[in-house]
């Protein structure tokens, strides 16, 4: 493993260049990115930005989370097959921001643990993915502590002339490791003023088979020894005849997208964007593997259908008369529903908890550009309305009774408001200045209507918080391909409804209760980026340090003076999020590309992250900090054939580096922690004509058994993937 990592350090991989999957000599500085919301040359941005645009790479993944995983640019945690929780520079879930087409996916119930919301965005219709590394609160507001994942779906394309013309794609994908079947169709119908883009994807996933090649030190790790069925009204723990089949991991998902573009002239656009995503029930696999005294703890534990509905209208204008030449406004509405259903083994009581969130949002951005640079002014408002319900059903008598809701059961709202200003100034001789400020105000009002079950010592939780965030940095772009950038930035995250009002258990015997006195978290970041980009090779390095102030860590707490309470029929230790810590997170990334033969490149990336906080006088590991991770590959490509042999790897995460009170899920690791691993993979794409593209991949060729840090499910074993894309 040591020699392997040395190879990574020598050859590296430019995350941005790998993401392009481009064998031409395009200079990194010439790449246009949307990190600043308006199209900007990446050389004019101090912050590190990762870019993924290869359509074959994007389309050949099982879901959007796997795009990030397989790129090697972002660590992703999974609790179940239908999941994927990105981690950027040691920050995860509600501490990073997910965006789709300029709209915030983060909402008032985004939890601080692990999320699966990213899979509700269909990767089959994605055009590009951008990753902003580090605090990005100046332009993006609350939650962007660790960074931003920007997902952009395809844009409708206009045609010449008044007559409508149609074109589109059909994609069929099959993968053996999970009996995966995915069908995708998209059609673009357009003339010179109107364009209609329609997309449909249907996905079916079976039980996920983990690798059979286990470490001799942990010969039974990850084995699925049992599964539960109910026969004649009785729960039965059955012996699993194939311990590598992770039973109860299958699910289905349907995604729809409709865009309507109207472009009355060269300088004005109107865009309607509708997205619908709905899944089947998705079993919480990690919970279904828990045991007590040799018996399963749960007979059932699953997420109900995960629904995400989005409608947005975007108005764009350019060459406007006046100080600002470019502008856009996005008004959006989202409706989100998620639920959790659980039943203990041999119990007739089945608990249903459902959350519905309605979100209204609007943001307006203006851009002034001249020979000295540009000035970007923006305003933003989002309003979240949360409804939380719960009940218990006796599956024997069908009688319903009351149980605690996950969040406050009365009227619950959050509002985000901001005004921001960002400047890019050309100082001459290759020097560029970035600086900006943002004023944030967040309001939260949660009402606890029924306190008879939990006996809350309060009936509401109200907060109004204001925060000023900003950034400043310098970049130097030399004429010989060298680039150096140094930046300072701050981030801000206001406690949301999930932080302030939630009652839940991350695992049996451990319950988290509300702490209405929780305050906002802040990050202060310094980073240095150095790179060199030439015809035959490119390399880059990023070093960062983040001070995490007012960090909310989950720690022991009391509820009505009690350190233990009865929850879900189990006497449980009480915990709550508390602003107890000042944490330090630091790390680096090295990356590069080397052209070894014509159209043949070696590419690689390696990321190291470390995070600690002080609990009194004791220094403790911060949770969510991934082990070292990365990717190395050799790729040959031309117009007809692309082939890449690559490896994805993770280093050790020793138990001494786990946060045992947080979200690191040590119960799903070995006694020593999460072992290091590496996989060998092959991906090929053959394009016999402009209308047909054929793909063949083998993931995890050696059938390695492994698991990502903090994950409750083992990764897929040897997996054969066939795909066919027909364009018309």
PLM segments and residue spans:
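Flexible loop and strand-edge segments within Gram-negative outer membrane beta-barrel domains
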Residues: 247-253, 263-324, 335-357, 406, ...
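N-terminal periplasmic "start-of-domain" segments of outer-membrane beta-barrel proteins
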Residues: 30-58, 85
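N-terminal periplasmic accessory domains that precede
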Residues: 62-68, 84-87, 98-99, 116-119, ...
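Transmembrane beta-barrel wall of Gram-negative outer-membrane proteins
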Residues: 178-204, 214-281, 307-309, 427, ...
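Outer membrane beta-barrel strand-and-loop segments of large Gram-negative receptors
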Residues: 355, 359-365, 416-418, 513-519, ...
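Surface-exposed extracellular loop regions of Gram-negative outer-membrane beta-barrel proteins
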Residues: 280, 335-339, 392-399, 443-454, ...
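Short acidic/polar hinge/loop motifs at secondary-structure boundaries
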Residues: 105-135
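Gram-negative outer-membrane beta-barrel transporters
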Residues: 428-429, 433, 441-442, 545-547, ...
């Amino acid at each position: 493993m040591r020699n392997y990592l040395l190879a990574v350090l020598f050859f590296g991989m430019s995350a941005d260049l790998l993401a392009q999957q481009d064998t031409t000599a395009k200079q990194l500085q010439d790449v246009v990115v949307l990190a600043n919301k308006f199209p900007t040359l990446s050389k004019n941005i101090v912050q590190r930005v990762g870019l993924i645009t290869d359509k074959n790479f994007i389309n050949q993944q099982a879901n959007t989370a796997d795009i990030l995983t397989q790129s090697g640019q972002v660590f992703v945690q999974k609790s179940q097959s239908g999941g994927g929780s990105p981690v950027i520079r040691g920050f995860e879930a509600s501490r990073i921001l997910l965006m789709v087409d300029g709209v915030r996916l983060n909402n008032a119930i985004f939890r601080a643990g692990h999320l699966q919301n990213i899979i509700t965005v269909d990767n089959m219709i994605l055009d590009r993915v951008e990753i902003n590394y580090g605090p990005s609160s100046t332009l993006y507001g609350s939650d962007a502590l660790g960074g931003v994942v920007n997902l952009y779906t395809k844009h409708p394309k206009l045609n010449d002339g008044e007559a409508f013309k149609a074109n589109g794609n059909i994609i069929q994908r099959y993968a053996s490791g999970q009996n995966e079947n995915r069908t995708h169709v998209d059609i673009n119908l357009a003339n010179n003023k109107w364009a209609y883009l329609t997309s449909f994807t249907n996905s079916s996933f079976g039980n996920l088979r983990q690798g059979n090649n286990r470490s001799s030190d942990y010969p039974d790790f990850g084995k699925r020894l049992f599964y539960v069925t109910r026969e004649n009204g009785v729960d039965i723990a059955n012996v699993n005849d194939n311990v590598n089949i992770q039973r109860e991991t299958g699910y289905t998902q349907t995604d729809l997208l409709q865009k309507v573009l109207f472009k009355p002239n060269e300088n004005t656009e109107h865009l309607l964007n509708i997205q619908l995503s709905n899944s089947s029930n998705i079993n919480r696999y990690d919970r279904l593997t828990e045991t007590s005294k040799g018996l399963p703890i749960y007979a059932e534990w699953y997420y109900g259908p995960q629904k995400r509905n989005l409608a947005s209208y975007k108005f764009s204008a350019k060459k406007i008369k006046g100080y600002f030449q470019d502008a856009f406004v996005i008004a959006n509405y989202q409706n989100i529903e998620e639920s959790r259903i659980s039943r203990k083994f041999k119990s007739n009581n089945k608990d249903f908890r459902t959350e519905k969130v309605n979100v209204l949002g609007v943001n307006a951005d203006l851009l002034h550009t001249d020979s000295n640079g540009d000035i970007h002014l923006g305003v933003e408002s989002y309003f979240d309305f949360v409804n939380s319900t719960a009940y218990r059903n006796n599956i024997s008598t069908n009688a319903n009774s009351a149980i605690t809701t996950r969040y406050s059961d009365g009227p619950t709202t959050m509002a985000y408001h901001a005004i921001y200003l960002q400047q890019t100034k050309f100082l001459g001789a290759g020097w560029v200045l970035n600086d900006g400020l943002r004023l944030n105000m967040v309001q939260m009002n949660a009402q606890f209507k029924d306190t008879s079950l939990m006996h809350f010592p309060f009936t509401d939780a109200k907060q109004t918080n204001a925060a000023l965030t900003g950034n400043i940095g310098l970049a130097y772009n030399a004429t010989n391909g060298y680039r150096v950038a140094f930046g300072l930035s701050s981030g801000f995250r206001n406690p949301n409804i999930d932080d302030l009002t939630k009652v839940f258990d991350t695992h049996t015997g451990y319950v988290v209760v509300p702490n209405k006195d929780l305050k906002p978290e802040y990050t202060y970041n310094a980073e240095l980026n150095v790179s060199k980009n030439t015809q035959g090779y490119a390399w880059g390095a990023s070093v960062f340090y983040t001070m995490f102030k007012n960090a909310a860590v989950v720690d022991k707490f009391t509820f009505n003076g009690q350190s233990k309470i009865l929850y879900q029929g189990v006497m449980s230790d009480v915990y709550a999020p508390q602003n107890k810590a000042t944490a330090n997170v630091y790390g680096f990334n090295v990356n590069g590309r080397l052209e070894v033969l014509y159209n043949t490149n070696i590419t690689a990336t390696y990321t190291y992250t470390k995070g600690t906080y002080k609990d009194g006088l004791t220094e403790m590991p911060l949770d969510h900090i991934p082990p070292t991770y990365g990717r190395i590959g050799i790729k040959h490509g031309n117009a007809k054939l692309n082939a890449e042999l690559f490896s994805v790897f993770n280093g050790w995460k020793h138990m001494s580096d786990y946060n045992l009170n947080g979200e690191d899920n040590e119960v799903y690791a070995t006694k020593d922690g999460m072992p290091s691993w590496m996989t060998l993979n092959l991906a090929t794409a053959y394009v016999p004509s402009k209308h047909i593209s054929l793909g063949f991949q083998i993931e995890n060729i050696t059938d390695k058994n492994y698991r990502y840090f903090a994950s409750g499910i083992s990764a897929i074993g040897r997996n054969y993937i066939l795909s066919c894309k027909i364009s018309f």
